[in-house]
Structure formats: structure tokens, C-alpha cells
A protein has these predicted regions:
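Extracytoplasmic cell-surface/polysaccharide-interacting catalytic and binding patches
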Residues: 1-53, 116-118, 126-134
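Catalytic cores and adjacent binding grooves of peptidoglycan-active enzymes
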Residues: 5, 78-134
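A generic short-segment signal for beta-strand/edge and adjacent turn/coil regions
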Residues: 28-30, 53-62, 89-94
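Generic alpha-helical scaffold signal
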Residues: 33, 37-44, 63, 67, ...
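Extended, low-complexity, intrinsically disordered C-terminal regulatory tails
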Residues: 44-75
Length: 134
């Protein structure tokens, strides 16, 4: 999984469109409410597997980010995977970020980014492997 296939959507036209069984385009929209949204097919696959494993909805705190929004986001990486549609910051009610990260590690043992934060887990499908605590 390397995020190679990234699709571009318009929230105005596609916001209610299902990108998978449990996720809609609008869930990945940048917090600045820009219309364009980039979403990686591989990322959606990982999120669906996480949802199936825990048997609970996965909530996306932050999906796609525009360059402008990312530059205003505290502690965001200059080349954040969110800017390319390859990342999501997620939480699951009743599941710790550490538990989410442990399962994501099984899905992405040699690739992808997994970051553990106090209230969410960052998951991305970059080609290289990266792990951190926020």
C-alpha cells in the first residue's frame, strides 16, 4: 500500500458520495472548507480494515489539508501526507490511539506513517515507513 492511486473530488458535487462502504467524500474535507478533496484509495482501504477489526465507526478528525490550511496548523509537517490525500487523523470511541496504532502496524508493517497522539492516531500510506509519538 503506497497511496499511488489518489482521486480528486469536489465536495459540492461529490460530498455525499461513498468512497467505500463506510466513508463519504465530505469526511475527508479540509477544515478550511475548500471544495477540492484528495483521497487515496489505499488510505480508504486501511481505514475500512481498521473499522472492521474494531467493529466500530472510525471518525476522521483531519483528512485532506490544503497547503494553506496545513501551513496554519500547529506542529504540522511542511510535507504533511495530509496535503496529498494520503493521511487521516482518526479516533474510535472506546479504543485508545495506541490500540489503533498497534493494529495499523499489522496492516502497514514496512510502509506508511503511524503517529500516536493523546486523542487520536495518525495513519498514512506513504511509501516509506515512519513512526512517532506526538
Amino acid at each position: 500500500m503506497n497511496g499511488a492511486s489518489v482521486k480528486v473530488y469536489s465536495v459540492a458535487n461529490d460530498g455525499s458520495k461513498q468512497v467505500s462502504a463506510h466513508f463519504k467524500v465530505r469526511e475527508f474535507q479540509c477544515h478550511d472548507k475548500s471544495d477540492t478533496v484528495f483521497i487515496s484509495d489505499a488510505l480508504v482501504t486501511v481505514l475500512e480494515k481498521i473499522r472492521a477489526h474494531f467493529g466500530k465507526p472510525v471518525h476522521i478528525n483531519s483528512g485532506y489539508r490544503t497547503d494553506a490550511y496545513n501551513s496554519r496548523t500547529k506542529d504540522a509537517a511542511k510535507f504533511s501526507q495530509h496535503k496529498y490525500g494520503l493521511a487521516a487523523d482518526i479516533h474510535i470511541d472506546g479504543v485508545t490511539p495506541k490500540e489503533i496504532a498497534a493494529y495499523a502496524e499489522k496492516l502497514l508493517p514496512n510502509t506508511g506513517g503511524i503517529g500516536i497522539y493523546k486523542s487520536f492516531c495518525h495513519v498514512d500510506v506513504r511509501k516509506a515507513k515512519s513512526r512517532w509519538n506526538g
